Amino acid sequence: MKKLAVLGDFLEPHHHAQIDSTAARCGFAVDYYPDGHVPAELAGQYEVLYGMPDRAALRTFTSLKWFCGSFAGVDAYLDDALYPSPDVILTNSSGAYGVTIAEHLIMVTLMLLRHASAYVLEAAAHRWGPVLPMRSIMGSTITVVGTGDIG
């Protein structure tokens, strides 16, 4: 049976269920490595790798056909010399982080409007001075410019 290695501990149980189901339909067995590392003596049995492996470890995946990074940018993994074969297919997880980035945008906007970084510094120094002026997003017009799922 073909094998898939999934690296990292960031997946929720429903992700595991979906990966297991899809892999089984495609004839793959799945092994999870929450610590992000596949022992070198086992790496050669995997045709598919998902996660963010150490670049130096990629050559130990001697049967590797497809590496899918668990992130959007794969620039650090573009060098063919990293892989046991120049035929390894490299893909990313672009599109998986839209909700996370949207929520991050709201969080950072509120932090800026409420001077969160200044308050953290003041609290760390045990200074409880006057309240800094704060703005609300209520009634504001906000424009977000970008392209794609996270832009």
Enumerate the language-model features and the residues they cover.
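Glycine-rich NAD(P)-binding loop of Rossmann-like domains
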Residues: Y119-G151
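Short, well-ordered beta-strand segments
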Residues: L4-V6, C68, T91, T143
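Electropositive phosphate-/nucleotide-binding environments in soluble metabolic enzymes
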Residues: P13, V99, E103, G148
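Short beta-strand/turn micro-motifs composed of small residues
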Residues: L7-G8, G51, F71, G146
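N-terminal glycine-/charge-rich "phosphate-binding" loop or analogous flexible N-terminal tail
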Residues: M1-V48
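Phosphate/diphosphate ligand-binding glycine-rich loop within oxidoreductases
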Residues: Q45-A123, M134-R135
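A generic local structural motif
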Residues: H16-A17, P34-V38, G51-A56, Y77-D79, ...
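Phosphate-coordination loops involved in phosphoryl transfer and adenosine-cofactor binding
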Residues: M1, D87, M138-T141
